Structure formats: structure tokens, C-alpha cells
């Protein structure tokens, strides 16, 4: 596992959940002796939707909705076998999407 890097990309709609998940990942990696870079906050993606309230007339009557997607990036440099095992056993919140890549 030497000279490798694990890149973990987290995505969630709630910033509290994603911050809690990144804190758990960083703490687990540091406890097992790996070097951690991050968490790096990536730009938040904002999607806005405008919906007409009235089905027929009154075009001025509209509702606007927004979905914010928060992103974080964590790099684990020189992970050990204990680090990989601990990360595999880690149980994160259901609202957090995790993508892991080895490089």
C-alpha cells in the first residue's frame, strides 16, 4: 500500500451531515497512522427551480425552490492496511454519498 493515495469525495444536501462524515473519516485515518490532507470544501452546487403556482392564469404567482449540493474532498496519503480496514468498517450517515478512488 506504500506510495498510494486514497481520494474520498463526499456529496450531501445537508452540510451538517457531510461535516460529521468528514470528521469521522479524518479521525479514523489519523488514528490508524495515515497522513490526511483535507477536508477540502469544494464549491457548493446550487440548482434553482421556478414553478408556477396557478395551473391556468396568474403568471406572476410563482414559487422558487433551491437544492444545494455540498461537496468535500479528503486525500489519505500512504494508507496502511489498518487504515483501509477501518475505513471499510466505517458506518456513515445515509444522506452522504461517498466516492472512493485509488491513485
Swiss-Prot record:
On whether Transcription is a keyword of this UniProt record, the answer is yes
Is Transcription regulation a UniProt keyword of this protein? yes
InterPro entries (alphabetical): Ribosomal_uS10, Ribosomal_uS10_CS, Ribosomal_uS10_dom, Ribosomal_uS10_dom_sf
The UniProt keywords, alphabetically, are: Ribonucleoprotein, Ribosomal protein, Ribosome biogenesis, RNA-binding, Transcription, Transcription antitermination, Transcription regulation
Q: Where are the transmembrane segments?
A: none
Q: From its record, what is one biological process in GO terms?
A: ribosome biogenesis
Tell me which Gene3D superfamilies the record gives.
Ribosomal protein S10 domain
Any one GO molecular function term: transcription antitermination factor activity, RNA binding
Q: What cellular component terms from Gene Ontology apply here?
A: cytoplasm; cytosol; cytosolic small ribosomal subunit; small ribosomal subunit; transcription elongation factor complex
This chain's function reads: Involved in the binding of tRNA to the ribosomes. Part of the processive rRNA transcription and antitermination complex (rrnTAC). The complex forms an RNA-chaperone ring around the RNA exit tunnel of RNA polymerase (RNAP). It supports rapid transcription and antitermination of rRNA operons, cotranscriptional rRNA folding, and annealing of distal rRNA regions to allow correct ribosome biogenesis. In complex with NusB is involved in the regulation of ribosomal RNA (rRNA) biosynthesis by transcriptional antitermination.
HAMAP family from the xrefs?
Ribosomal_uS10
NCBIfam families xref list: PRK00596.1, rpsJ_bact
Could you describe the subunit structure of this protein? Part of the 30S ribosomal subunit. Can also form a heterodimer with the transcription antitermination protein NusB. Binding of S10 to NusB is mutually exclusive with its incorporation into the ribosome. The rRNA transcription and antitermination complex (rrnTAC) consists of RNAP, NusA, NusB, NusE (this protein), NusG, SubB, ribosomal protein S4, DNA and precursor rRNA; S4 is more flexible than other subunits.
Family assignment from sequence similarity = Belongs to the universal ribosomal protein uS10 family.
Which PANTHER family does the record match to this protein? 30S RIBOSOMAL PROTEIN S10 FAMILY MEMBER
What is the designated name of this protein? Answer: Small ribosomal subunit protein uS10
Q: From which lineage does this chain's organism come?
A: Bacteria, Pseudomonadati, Pseudomonadota, Gammaproteobacteria, Enterobacterales
Amino acid at each position: 500500500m506504500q506510495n498510494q493515495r486514497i481520494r474520498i469525495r463526499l456529496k450531501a444536501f445537508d452540510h451538517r451531515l457531510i461535516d460529521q462524515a468528514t470528521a469521522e473519516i479524518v479521525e479514523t485515518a489519523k488514528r490508524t497512522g495515515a497522513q490526511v490532507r483535507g477536508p477540502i470544501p469544494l464549491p457548493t452546487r446550487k440548482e434553482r427551480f421556478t414553478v408556477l403556482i396557478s395551473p391556468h392564469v396568474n403568471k406572476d404567482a410563482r414559487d422558487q425552490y433551491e437544492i444545494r449540493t455540498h461537496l468535500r474532498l479528503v486525500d489519505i496519503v500512504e494508507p496502511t492496511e489498518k487504515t483501509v480496514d477501518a475505513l471499510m468498517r466505517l458506518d456513515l450517515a445515509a444522506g452522504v454519498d461517498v466516492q472512493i478512488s485509488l491513485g
